[in-house]
Amino acid sequence: MSDKLVVWMDCEMTGLRLDSDKLIEVSALVTDSDLNILGDGVDIVIHADDAALAAMPPVVAEMHARSGLTDEVRRSTVTVAEAEQQVLDYIRQYVPTPRTVPLAGNSIATDRAFIARDMPALDAHLHYRMIDVSSIKELCRRWYPRIYFGQPEKGLTHRALADIKESIRELEYYRRTAFVAPPGPSTAEIAAVAAQLGGTAQTAESPQVEGTTQAD
């Protein structure tokens, strides 16, 4: 798996019911390992019929009406298949080889479930590993509450592209506040921690090869 790039995605749906709700907006950005955004990304509003929009739970209907997404969905002529192709075209500019780059975002498993359901070719192009910023948030809530409560406020626009950019900014915040500063601990310090936890540290000279037996 590549350690240089990350694919970021966010989706807006008519709800969270995987058996019935519709995917109505999808956005994607690719970053390098330092979270610099590559290119302009894509942001695509997908058409849904009035029946699907009428079935939205009240809180979702109010959210999408306030953001303007509902009106854009009605005006859109883009199908799910067309949106999938546009996202793939953008991602393949930077990630031509399938299953080499992880998917990132906030609570990204929810987005991934709708992507897998509606956009199987896109799902297959992404590595199965995911980077969930929400997991780091929850760890900071428990281990570093000052970091958790000091995080920058979110815009809460509930539009896909804006949400991705906020997720990238949030991860950069945690990187600067919660993670060990580069280049990280020394080899001896790493070995000591590994020994305390009952394991053996991998050496920098012998990286684990993708597909071997190490648990992941």
UniProtKB/Swiss-Prot annotation:
CDD domains (UniProt xref): Orn
Molecular function terms, GO-annotated: 3'-5'-RNA exonuclease activity; nucleic acid binding
Gene Ontology CC terms, in alphabetical order: cytoplasm
Entry annotation: catalytic residues: Y128
This protein's UniProt keywords: Cytoplasm, Exonuclease, Hydrolase, Nuclease
Keyword Transcription regulation: no
Domain of life: Bacteria
EC number(s) given by UniProt: 3.1.15.-
UniProt-annotated location(s): Cytoplasm
Family, similarity comment: Belongs to the oligoribonuclease family.
PANTHER family: OLIGORIBONUCLEASE, MITOCHONDRIAL
HAMAP family from the UniProt entry: Oligoribonuclease
Protein purpose: 3'-to-5' exoribonuclease specific for small oligoribonucleotides.
Protein name stated in the entry: Oligoribonuclease
Natural source organism: Nocardia farcinica (strain IFM 10152)
Top-level taxonomy: Bacteria, Bacillati, Actinomycetota, Actinomycetes, Mycobacteriales
